[in-house]
């Protein structure tokens, strides 16, 4: 089985090349793609419009293998979280969030994360490896057909998952070569048929890869901002030491020249006494002044030993009002799935930490540190 080719690893061009390598005509690739991604077929015997000789050939050479489900949890609010096996002792989490007019899937791109944002439990487990294209798109494949079964939907019914956010475990732009083909499949009309506006990639700010994505596959972009100045962001998002705010904002402006939406979504985790003052909000307005944007304020979801607390509702309201008064669309994310640890910042999975010390050092250590905000000082506890 280890020598089998996993067809989930192929986007349209890859599947075409594979079919041609088998001596098959090009139209077979589209047939095969529809069976896999639109019908959810995992058995070549089901693919009745393929020649029997091709089905037999595929059965001995290829497989359709999504990550195996280890656990499956349903929240009281309808959120569903899967823990899936990606081998070598690693597992990642995939979360489905139902809403009245859409169904959003939060997909992981790495086993662990080397960026090690201070407020995120994923980074505390270290980094093991990048996921393959098949492991990334396999989360969508698995979730779509699991949800269809749960809701009693057939192959001709509307898709359950209407939006995908690359906001699970990992930094997508540090796994570029696997993430982009996976997103191509999400957009492909012979696969999942999502629009570029309905696929959102969230990044902590890997500037060179943001520029590359703008040329290769400009989907909707969300940027994990979380701080109003470089001194604070260096602590909360250590990648900022490599790509500081001025460079990041310039990259956002360049990206908007090609983006499917005319704004960048900035994500901002609200941390009590750290980044949530009215002064921080005013400083933030100066940082994003030249970037058309909206803000998504995220109440912090505590996890053991984080040393951080969630801002209270009144403080979040005051912070958001500063942004709203400046004409910036600002939303406060409703916490979903927190009873099954599926809320933002809680995805940790099970990771065998193989992070090289040099890799960790690149983004800085987690230590007790005095953080100077816009007009206040706060000492963050050790994580």
From Swiss-Prot:
Essential cofactor(s): [4Fe-4S] cluster
Active site residues of this protein: 93 (proton acceptor), 344 (s-methylcysteine intermediate)
Molecular function GO labels: 4 iron, 4 sulfur cluster binding; metal ion binding; rRNA (adenine(2503)-C2-)-methyltransferase activity; rRNA binding; tRNA (adenine(37)-C2)-methyltransferase activity; tRNA binding
Cofactor note: Binds 1 [4Fe-4S] cluster. The cluster is coordinated with 3 cysteines and an exchangeable S-adenosyl-L-methionine.
GO annotations of cellular component type: cytoplasm
Segments forming domain Radical SAM core: 99-339
GO biological process, one term: tRNA methylation
The reaction(s) this protein catalyses: adenosine(2503) in 23S rRNA + 2 reduced [2Fe-2S]-[ferredoxin] + 2 S-adenosyl-L-methionine = 2-methyladenosine(2503) in 23S rRNA + 5'-deoxyadenosine + L-methionine + 2 oxidized [2Fe-2S]-[ferredoxin] + S-adenosyl-L-homocysteine; adenosine(37) in tRNA + 2 reduced [2Fe-2S]-[ferredoxin] + 2 S-adenosyl-L-methionine = 2-methyladenosine(37) in tRNA + 5'-deoxyadenosine + L-methionine + 2 oxidized [2Fe-2S]-[ferredoxin] + S-adenosyl-L-homocysteine
Chief place of localization: cytoplasm
EC number(s) reported in the record: 2.1.1.192
Gene3D superfamilies: 1.10.150.530, Aldolase class I
Keywords in alphabetical order: 4Fe-4S, Cytoplasm, Disulfide bond, Iron, Iron-sulfur, Metal-binding, Methyltransferase, rRNA processing, S-adenosyl-L-methionine, Transferase, tRNA processing
Residues given in the record as S-adenosyl-L-methionine binding sites: 170-171, 202, 224-226, 301
Cellular localization per UniProt: Cytoplasm
Coiled coil (residue ranges): none
Cystine bridges: 106-344
Binding site for [4Fe-4S] cluster: 113, 117, 120
HAMAP family tied to this protein: RNA_methyltr_RlmN (MF_01849)
NCBIfam families, sorted: rRNA_mod_RlmN (TIGR00048)
Miscellaneous: Reaction proceeds by a ping-pong mechanism involving intermediate methylation of a conserved cysteine residue.
Function: Specifically methylates position 2 of adenine 2503 in 23S rRNA and position 2 of adenine 37 in tRNAs. m2A2503 modification seems to play a crucial role in the proofreading step occurring at the peptidyl transferase center and thus would serve to optimize ribosomal fidelity.
Family: Belongs to the radical SAM superfamily. RlmN family.
Stated name of the protein: Dual-specificity RNA methyltransferase RlmN
Species of origin: Ralstonia nicotianae (strain ATCC BAA-1114 / GMI1000) (Ralstonia solanacearum)
């Amino acid at each position: 089985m280890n020598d089998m080719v996993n067809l989930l690893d192929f986007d349209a061009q890859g599947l075409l090349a594979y079919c041609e390598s088998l001596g098959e005509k090009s139209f077979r690739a589209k047939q095969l793609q529809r069976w896999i991604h639109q019908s959810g077929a995992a058995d070549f015997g089901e693919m009745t419009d393929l020649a029997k000789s091709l089905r037999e050939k595929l059965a001995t050479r290829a497989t359709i293998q999504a990550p195996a489900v280890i656990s499956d949890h349903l929240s009281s609010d309808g959120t569903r979280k899967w823990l899936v096996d990606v081998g070598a002792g690693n597992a990642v989490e995939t979360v489905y969030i139902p809403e009245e007019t859409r169904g959003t899937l939060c997909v992981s791109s790495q086993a662990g994360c080397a960026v090690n944002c201070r407020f995120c439990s994923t980074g505390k487990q270290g980094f093991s490896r990048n996921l393959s294209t098949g492991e990334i798109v396999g989360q969508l494949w698995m979730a779509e057909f699991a949800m269809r079964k749960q809701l009693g939907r057939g192959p001709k019914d509307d898709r359950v998952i209407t939006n995908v956010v690359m906001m699970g475990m990992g930094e997508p732009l540090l796994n570029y070569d696997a993430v982009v083909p996976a997103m191509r499949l999400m957009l492909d009309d012979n696969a999942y048929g999502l629009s570029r506006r309905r696929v959102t990639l969230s990044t902590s700010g890997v500037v060179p890869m943001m520029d590359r994505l703008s040329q290769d596959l400009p989907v909707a972009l969300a940027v994990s901002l979380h701080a109003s100045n470089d001194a604070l962001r260096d602590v909360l998002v250590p990648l900022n030491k490599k790509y500081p705010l001025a460079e990041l904002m310039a990259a956002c402006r360049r990206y908007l020249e090609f983006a499917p939406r005319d704004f960048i979504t900035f994500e901002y985790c609200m941390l009590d006494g750290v980044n949530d003052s009215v002064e921080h909000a005013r400083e933030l307005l100066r940082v994003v002044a030249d970037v058309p944007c909206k803000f998504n304020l995220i109440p912090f979801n505590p996890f053991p030993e984080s040393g951080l607390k969630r801002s209270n509702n009144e403080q979040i309201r005051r912070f958001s009002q500063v942004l709203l008064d400046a004409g910036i669309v600002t939303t406060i994310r409703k916490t979903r799935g927190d009873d099954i640890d599926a809320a933002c910042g809680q995805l940790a999975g099970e990771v065998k930490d193989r992070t090289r010390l040099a890799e960790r050092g690149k983004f800085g250590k987690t230590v007790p540190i005095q953080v100077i905000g816009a007009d206040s000082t706060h000492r963050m506890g050790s994580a």
